């Protein structure tokens, strides 16, 4: 059963007498999820639809992430996680609710409307442990990319939006709306002992890793990274050269540091 609260915004009508308003329906709704209320686009055909129908998204993957972080939490008093390609924030919300004040999360989203929804969800749940960034994570900081956003009032897989053309696109039929500029950021901007990185940025994963060389020289975070659209060979070699162990997790690579203390069962080893 889909559970949602439809939200409508009131705007003052310039042609009406003072005090009159007209209402413009929004495609966004506040939905119940396993982790608290979350703002979703009712036209979203993948993430939003699954949350509306089941209360979650990638529940098995989220469960795996939590188990891995629980292992790290046994030796760390506070965890640091990056949600790269946060979309509307279901992963950040789940991890923040589960670990509470024991985790600090940086969530990055390039699509401004999704970033706004992410921020709204954080406010609805009074979550202070997540800092959200309207940035496209890439190999450099301070560059700008002009992107043509999809039409959020029509059905589509908004999480599949591609900031730059990837090696393998599955989204050429997306109906476009208007163009705007987003600034890039490299993960090397942050010099902190990050424990976990979830990365799903529709083909820009290789560029994001190129902007994180210093990070991986100093720290060895667990990485859960999508490899469907990106330069797969580069990504695999990146982790192999750093003595990571790699496992297939659906369309994702789970990369564990060589010193991770617990063996992995139930996933196919890639290296």
Segment roles from a protein language model:
Residues 1-271:
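Phosphate/nucleotide-binding beta-alpha loop and adjacent structural elements of enzyme active sites
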């Amino acid at each position: 059963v889909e559970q949602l609260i439809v939200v409508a915004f009131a705007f003052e009508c310039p042609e009406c007498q003072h005090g009159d308003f007209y209402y413009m329906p929004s495609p966004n709704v506040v939905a119940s999820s396993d982790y608290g209320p979350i703002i979703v686009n009712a036209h979203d055909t993948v993430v939003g639809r699954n949350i509306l129908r089941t209360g979650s998204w990638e529940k098995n993957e989220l469960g795996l992430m939590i188990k891995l972080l629980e292992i790290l939490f046994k030796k760390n008093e506070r965890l640091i996680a990056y949600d790269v390609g946060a979309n509307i924030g279901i992963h950040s919300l789940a991890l923040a609710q589960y670990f509470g004040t024991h985790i600090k999360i940086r969530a990055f989203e390039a699509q401004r409307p999704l970033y706004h929804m992410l921020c709204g969800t954080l406010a609805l749940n009074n979550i202070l442990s997540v800092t959200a960034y309207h940035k496209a994570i890439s190999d450099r900081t301070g560059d700008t990319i002009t992107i043509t956003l999809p039409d959020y009032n029509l059905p589509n897989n908004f999480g599949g939006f591609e900031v730059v053309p990837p090696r393998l696109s599955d989204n050429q039929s997306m109906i476009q709306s208007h163009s705007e500029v987003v600034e890039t950021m490299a993960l090397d901007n942050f010099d902190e002992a990050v424990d976990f990185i979830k990365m799903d940025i529709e083909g820009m994963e290789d560029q994001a890793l190129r902007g994180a060389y210093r990070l991986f020289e100093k720290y060895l975070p667990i990485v859960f990274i999508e490899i469907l659209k990106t330069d797969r060979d580069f990504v695999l070699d990146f982790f192999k050269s750093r003595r990571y162990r790699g496992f297939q997790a659906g369309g994702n690579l789970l990369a564990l540091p060589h010193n991770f203390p617990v063996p992995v069962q139930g996933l196919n080893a890639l290296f």
